[in-house]
A protein has these predicted regions:
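Nucleic-acid endo/exonuclease domains
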Residues: 1-113, 117-167
């Protein structure tokens, strides 16, 4: 089937597809801000240019659209026209996402992926609760490091002296 749009019309239509500040991203960003997390957006220096970067916790969050990133869910409806092109494109996107996640993890970053379908009205609260749990675990990992103080030598003797004698 021939394309019903001229190349100029197709270009104008495709150029309006947003890659930043999408509704799912804004939902996650507002929630993070209200929870007290501070972040940067679209840091170019990191592989994959993550949507949300929390440097303090070495955590990045990708908010992926189900169609563009090939999430196998009910929201992922592939076009029937030019199907091979779209399949190849989405496969390349998936491969790129896998490479970016691996590179970030190898560099010591925590990588979280939130899918568009997880933020619909039905699943949003559950998804944000799960995100809260995971971020809490990450924060605890970073704050529960080695103790910054040590016992004086004379205290170790006192503790031994207070223990009952062994028969």
């Amino acid at each position: 089937m021939a394309d019903r749009m001229t190349p100029e019309q197709r270009h104008r239509c495709m150029s309006r597809i947003r890659g930043r500040d999408t509704k799912p991203e804004l939902v996650v960003r507002r929630w993070l801000w209200h929870q007290g997390f501070r972040y940067r957006l679209y840091v170019k220096a990191l592989p994959g240019r993550p949507d949300i970067v929390m440097r303090k916790w070495r955590t990045v969050i990708f908010v992926n659209g189900c169609f563009w990133h090939g999430h196998d869910c009910q929201s992922d409806r592939r076009p029937t026209t030019n199907a091979q092109f779209w399949q190849d494109k989405i496969d390349r996107n998936r491969e790129r996402d896998t490479r970016n996640v691996a590179a970030l993890q190898a560099a010591g970053w925590h990588v979280l992926v939130v899918w568009e379908c997880q933020l619909n009205a039905k699943n949003r609260q559950q998804t944000l609760r799960e995100l809260d749990v995971r971020l809490s675990q990450i924060v605890l990992e970073h704050t529960a490091g080695p103790k910054r103080y040590s016992e004086p030598d004379h205290c170790a003797d006192l503790l031994v002296a207070a223990e009952p004698d062994q028969p």
